[in-house]
Amino acid sequence: MPELATSGNAFDKRRFSRRGFLGAGIASGFALAACASKPTASGAAGMTAAIDAAEAARPHSGRTVTATLTPQPARIDLGGPIVSTLTYGNTIPGPLIRATVGDEIVVSVTNRLGDPTSVHWHGIALRNDMDGTEPATANIGPGGDFTYRFSVPDPGTYWAHPHVGLQGDHGLYLPVVVDDPTEPGHYDAEWIIILDDWTDGIGKSPQQLYGELTDPNKPTMQNTTGMPEGEGVDSNLLGGDGGDIAYPYYLINGRIPVAATSFKAKPGQRIRIRIINSAADTAFRIALAGHSMTVTHTDGYPVIPTEVDALLIGMAERYDVMVTAAGGVFPLVALAEGKNALARALLSTGAGSPPDPQFRPDELNWRVGTVEMFTAATTANLGRPEPTHDLPVTLGGTMAKYDWTINGEPYSTTNPLHVRLGQRPTLMFDNTTMMYHPIHLHGHTFQMIKADGSPGARKDTVIVLPKQKMRAVLVADNPGVWVMHCHNNYHQVAGMATRLDYIL
């Protein structure tokens, strides 16, 4: 395993023989072609021209980064348990894709699953027809091929995953890093951390869990705890319930806590840690024992450096932090928030033995970084929104009915939000439910507006707590048809999604 992930794959390449394995499929909640308003021929041509013009305006370096992905069934070793699951080329996580601002990424995908699939490039402000989500991009049928081709305009930590049904709760995910040729930070090493919650091949399948969650006859206790299996505890950071599912395992870079991966560095080195939460239903509180962390980026964009001891990271969020390595062996612990379990990896800079796999460092309970603590760097500010242009994003639903909605409708009957190119609306998040929801907008980032009206962090995914209202400014600069949804995979499939459609 390469220890310094400056290029290539930063993860173990554990390969095992294939075995035909596909669980029961759930139809994609994002196949909107049948229910979406069909544009006229002139309207479609105008949108295509607008998408092409936006692509031409992006920076272009003249370089091309190529990759090949093969989503397929595989047998994977999680560090003891060997599971049948779905992966990109027999590894969890999949291979790192790395580019520099302005590069063109060309990824050829061959679908060896028994169901349609896609690859969504999470957080990248790419051209709409390469987003990897219906209706903008058609799914790839079983046995089919597709080539994604797009330029990358912004540096940052991103990731890729499917956008079909519950495929996001298998092993189909990989990191994407876009380097900044003018990177102002100085560091000696880079450590990519991908968090995950895991049931596939060990516990009930994602499809079985979804069936339990949507069963109108499920036990009353499940309606209040949100946990079909195991015991959960309330989370103060999340405003209550920590999630819907108690998973058998929680992973860092594809490994269970007793078989944690180890990152080797030298005492005194500055390490940039890129943290990605790929989990389907779990937010994590993450800390590195014996170290403080300086948060430098949220969802790829720079913030005023802020020192914390731990971080709350919701599903699909990314944080970049800097640490100065001490001497010894230190666990990096990701507490599954509200679920009384953890994932871990090890930082090894010298002699020593790691503590017990269930060890929880004190730092988890000290200064915990949450989104409202961070402010975008001047270079990342989006400015003020238009004073009279609000876009409502009202989150609704209950655990009892599992009827998650945005603006009162499930995705199948959604009324899309509308913007015109160049507008600067305010996203008005309003969570009327008793659960937290990490809300993600495709193809864009937005800038949070703090409670006092001051500018906050740039985000493409933000946790909206129960009964919380939040605001963010959006710059409409990427024409197309874009999905906005809860990044709890189960809420998303149940209907908590809408669209942001550009009007020409």
Curated annotation (Swiss-Prot):
Effect of C486A: Lack of activity
PROSITE patterns according to UniProt: MULTICOPPER_OXIDASE1, MULTICOPPER_OXIDASE2, TAT
Membrane-related topology note: Peripheral membrane protein
InterPro entries, alphabetized: Cu-oxidase-like_N, Cu-oxidase_2nd, Cu-oxidase_C, Cu-oxidase_fam, Cu_oxidase_CS, Cu_oxidase_Cu_BS, Cupredoxin, CuRO_3_CopA
Up-regulation conditions: Repressed by RicR. Induced by copper.
Cofactor: Cu cation
Record EC number: 1.16.3.1
Gene Ontology CC entries for this record: periplasmic space; plasma membrane
Binding site for Cu cation 3: H163, H442, H485
One Pfam short name: Cu-oxidase_3
Cofactor binding, per record: Binds 4 Cu cations per monomer.
Name of this chain's protein: Multicopper oxidase MmcO
Native species: Mycobacterium tuberculosis (strain ATCC 25618 / H37Rv)
